Amino acid sequence: MEEIQRYLQPDRSQQHNFLYPLIFQEYIYALAHDHGLNRNRSILLENPGYDNKFSFLIVKRLITRMYQQNHFLISTNDSNKNSFLGCNKSLYSQMISEGFAFIAEIPFSLRLMSSLSSFEGKNIFKSHNLRSIHSTFPFLEDNFSHLNYVLDILIPYPVHLEILVQTLRYWVKDASSLHLLRFFLHEYWNLNSLITSKKPGYSFSKKNQRFFFFLYNSYGYECESTFVFLRNQSSHLRSTSFGALLERIYFYGKIERLVEVFAKDFQVTLWLFKDPFMHYVRYQGKSIMASKGTFLLMNKWKFYLVNFWQCHFSLCFHTGRIHINQLSNHSRDFMGYLSSVRLNPSMVRSQMLENSFLINNAIKKFDILVPIIPLIGSLAKENFCTVLGHPISKPVWSDLSDSDIIDRFGRICRNIFHYYSGSSKKKTLYRIKYILRLSCARTLARKHKSTVRTFLKRSGSELLEEFLTSEEQVLSLTFPRASSSLWGVYRSRIWYLDIFCINDLANSQ
């Protein structure tokens, strides 16, 4: 029991007191910190004009005004104005929230930079190349052919604003900062405007995205921290923490209720969840946990997570948000990829003296495929083709110049190839390339009031060479000195660190 309590004690060395005075007085230190992170644009250096809404000086003055005025004198005639602010509430709230998010990110950024400084002779890497989505690439690279079941988990919604505040209580030690955050949330927004749950993820309003993404990520740390704790306690080989890529915080003092319930049989409980073949990843509001265990073990995980989240976050969490699927019978739709395990038949001939036997072996193979139907649906929605995949012209682009039309089609094609470069089978991408290329030709022919064949004969086929840049040419520029033995690895699957999402097809930049 003493050993358990030692593990549950908060790790003081990993906690950073929240520098609350930065908001009011010592902004010079924040300026130095911001300069050290090599940010391209600093909210501290922007001029406090009307176009630069996130100036740190404006944030400081607004918060000071909030504390100098009477908070209870709130106008009821105009929902967008407050008497203690004397101006547009949404504008001021956006500026304050962005400034608060910047200050709150400092302890996490310091921890990130300290972990990165140990590499390459203390050289600081640019943190914009290390994001949460990059932790999904090793997950998709894992061999799932030996696994049996997958848990599809939708992280529960934070049904109360106080939950968002309490998620920071182990990191933010300044009580006045928490009071400011609590007052800010309850004053300006209600839950329906903070997080909308119409889709199986989370969507935030376009205003104050940085602030609420920070709160939601902190909430996500809390939800998934149970995996880190149980994994470290049940596994013989302790996993090495790499804070630059994994967006998790330590569990420790956050399962007191669990220890109270399982204090006597704690080791038995850990034995139930001991699984050296556990694979876990989270991106946005969805988590996936794959295991080699039986259906009974996965069902235990399911009910354990439901009970834990209900007790720890004081919310009603439905079991329907966690689905148990057999990996061999279901395809996984994750981050735009379609992953599945298929049986690859192979024939083996066995020779024994004068007799020979032919043995059929079915070997499991894990594939990451390009979802052709959703991609064609997206192209059809943007009027590049029909719902059956037949290319059509795009009349709204007919007024553009020929070079602009070709550049837009080529950019969309390159973005799709870039995003799905990690796919194990790329034949589907060439069908998408055919659709976009023919749609581009028909758009140009429509503009010049001719047929596609006539236009190509008059202009020449080199007009569409924007689409002819093959992956091999791109790889030769990316890996000019790659040896022949490594060329097959580069050619098969490549993950680019600048991938965040598929841009809107019509407005991709």
Swiss-Prot record:
<dbReference type="InterPro" id="IPR002866">
    <property type="entry name" value="Maturase_MatK"/>
</dbReference>
<dbReference type="GO" id="GO:0008033">
    <property type="term" value="P:tRNA processing"/>
</dbReference>
<dbReference type="GO" id="GO:0003723">
    <property type="term" value="F:RNA binding"/>
</dbReference>
<keyword id="KW-0694">RNA-binding</keyword>
<dbReference type="Pfam" id="PF01824">
    <property type="entry name" value="MatK_N"/>
</dbReference>
<comment type="similarity">
    <text>Belongs to the intron maturase 2 family. MatK subfamily.</text>
</comment>
<dbReference type="InterPro" id="IPR024937">
    <property type="entry name" value="Domain_X"/>
</dbReference>
<keyword id="KW-0819">tRNA processing</keyword>
<dbReference type="GO" id="GO:0006397">
    <property type="term" value="P:mRNA processing"/>
</dbReference>
<keyword id="KW-0934">Plastid</keyword>
<dbReference type="GO" id="GO:0009507">
    <property type="term" value="C:chloroplast"/>
</dbReference>
<keyword id="KW-0507">mRNA processing</keyword>
<protein>
    <recommendedName>
        <fullName>Maturase K</fullName>
    </recommendedName>
</protein>
<dbReference type="InterPro" id="IPR024942">
    <property type="entry name" value="Maturase_MatK_N"/>
</dbReference>
<dbReference type="Pfam" id="PF01348">
    <property type="entry name" value="Intron_maturas2"/>
</dbReference>
<keyword id="KW-0150">Chloroplast</keyword>
<dbReference type="GO" id="GO:0008380">
    <property type="term" value="P:RNA splicing"/>
</dbReference>
<comment type="function">
    <text>Usually encoded in the trnK tRNA gene intron. Probably assists in splicing its own and other chloroplast group II introns.</text>
</comment>
